[in-house]
């Protein structure tokens, strides 16, 4: 059975194992999620479980959102996402961090930090040209292709907006689960800035 929960990235820290090994971990705060809707093939054309996280201030809500949340006997949520494969979920039920356990392999999805408009060296990791005084090629994008084509080829790595993309890191291992604090500690780093939305779900390519 697949598992999933929504949370917020708190930051990074480090923990030590019993034999003294240091492990860098990301702290994810996941207060209880509420099941807002259970979709089925008969009514929606596909099966999924809609989950809400983080209460939204009433001044920012509208009547449709309030009515949708009222069906689950809860308040409108700031973040609403769908999971596939959450069997046995019922409308109004809560999903807590203790559905996961230490050692579980998960995929973590977040929105990467936006870096603004950047050149090809920072954005794509290209090498720079000679920095000598006579060189006319320092941090430029390089060749645009042959003359005969008379156009820039598709997929050419150029300058542009960097970051602020949906990124998924696969096969991360949960180091610890702290139910009393609604916290999950995941080995390694995950995409996104502090306080950004994080989606944690069972790994689809777990070995």
From Swiss-Prot:
Tell me, in a sentence or two, what this protein's role is: One of the primary rRNA binding proteins, it binds directly near the 3'-end of the 23S rRNA, where it nucleates assembly of the 50S subunit.
Q: Which GO terms describe its molecular function?
A: rRNA binding; structural constituent of ribosome
Which NCBIfam families is this protein grouped with?
L3_bact
Protein name, as recorded: Large ribosomal subunit protein uL3
Please name the InterPro entries in this protein's record.
Ribosomal_uL3 (IPR000597), Ribosomal_uL3_bac/org-type (IPR019927), Ribosomal_uL3_CS (IPR019926), Transl_B-barrel_sf (IPR009000)
Xref: Pfam families: Ribosomal_L3 (PF00297)
The Swiss-Prot or TrEMBL record describes its family as follows:
Belongs to the universal ribosomal protein uL3 family.
State the organism named in the record: Lactococcus lactis subsp. cremoris (strain MG1363)
Cellular component, GO annotation:
cytosolic large ribosomal subunit
Q: What keywords tag this UniProt record? A: Ribonucleoprotein, Ribosomal protein, RNA-binding, rRNA-binding
- Please list which residues make up the signal peptide: none
**What is the protein's quaternary organization?**
Part of the 50S ribosomal subunit. Forms a cluster with proteins L14 and L19.
